[in-house]
Amino acid sequence: MTANALGGPAPVLPPNQTPPGGVTSPRTGPAVPRGRVRDLHPGWFASVMGTAILAVATYLNPGNQTAMQGAAHGLGAGLAVLAYALGAVMTIVYAVRWARYRDAALADLHHPVLGAMHATLPGGLLVLAVMTSVVGPQLLPAGAVTALIAVLAALGSVLAVVISVAFAMTLFVGAPPAASVNGGWFIPPVVTIIIPMALTPLVAHVGPGTARLLLALGYAAYGMGFLLFLMVLGLLHDRLVLHPLPPAQLAPTLWIGLGPVGVAALAPLALARAGQDLFGVAAPSVTVLSQLFGTAIWGFGLWWLAIAVTLLVRYLRAGPLPFHLGWWAFTFPLGAYTVATVTLARSWQAPVLEGVAVLLYLALVGFWVVVTARTVTATHAGRIWHR
């Protein structure tokens, strides 16, 4: 083992593999295009997730200031277009990589750090579906909005479950060391929890039988993802308590815990709203219970946010964090928690929570701007392609 920046041993990783984003190789200059596709980092879709959730958060106008409504909708729509463009490009590149360089993709899937990041692909598709339900009506005809949500939700849901099972199997049979447990393992669970958020906008556009099926699938996916989140949470807690802190390269992954917390707070509310007609006289009770449960989960997020900020400060005091694509972990999780805060603030009609949402949103914008700028710079210089 090698020592990390905080004095502890770095996690054991398989030979010829690197932490998320990779450590730059001895090569200089950009790699050839074929090599870029073959060695494509599986976490690129995190940029889609981060940009799409920022579009949603912006469109919701944190602070709920009437004077800002038009600007919020306009900026949210612009960010949505950018997210669509990123999603289209990344989908094509990911498909080419799996079709032409399957061995390289499978090798990454078996990596204890990179493997979980394959779930950013379905995560990106599902967050685009959620974004389409919020921002889409301003950009697309009503029929196109519903069709696009259906396609993104179907494809994203299937891939979310498949990749979650596949990555879990690589861990079960690969017996990785305890020190390799990291916050990236939250990605498959949070992506599964997003499934009901992508399915619920379709409930109003289908018949009663299909609506009941969509709600049942939504609750089932929620249970699957939430319980997986709790299992990973226990593993990561033990790893942080019983072992030295992860190396600086893995510091951003500790923020990913905010993702499942934020989405887990949002999904019950979305399911309750979508099922109003089907729940009948029980609908008000379901709504209240969903709001209470979501608020309780959100409360845990405050604790996790405090831990994530404190650990980040500790890492920064030990030295600068090396930039890599894993920095996108600062965006979607915080964005999901921000959207959850906005939603709960308006459910409770609590101005104080709305103020908290504004602070979280400003932090989200700051992270997104910095990470986007660093990504563009590293891409232009060719450093982003080195593994």
Locations of regions flagged by a protein language model:
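N-terminal signal-anchor module of multipass membrane proteins
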Residues: 2-95, 100
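Juxtamembrane helix-loop boundaries in multi-pass membrane proteins
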Residues: 28-60, 76, 80, 102-130, ...
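Helical transmembrane-bundle signal
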Residues: 49-56, 80-83, 87-94, 127-130, ...
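Extracellular/periplasmic helix-loop-helix junctions in multi-pass membrane proteins
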Residues: 64-70, 206-215, 275-286, 315-319, ...
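Transmembrane alpha-helix boundary signature
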Residues: 94-102, 130-143, 169
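Generic multipass alpha-helical transmembrane bundles of integral membrane proteins
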Residues: 151, 155, 182-308
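Extended, compositionally biased non-globular segments
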Residues: 285-346
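Small-residue-rich transmembrane alpha-helices that serve as helix-helix interface/gating elements
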Residues: 297-298, 354-370
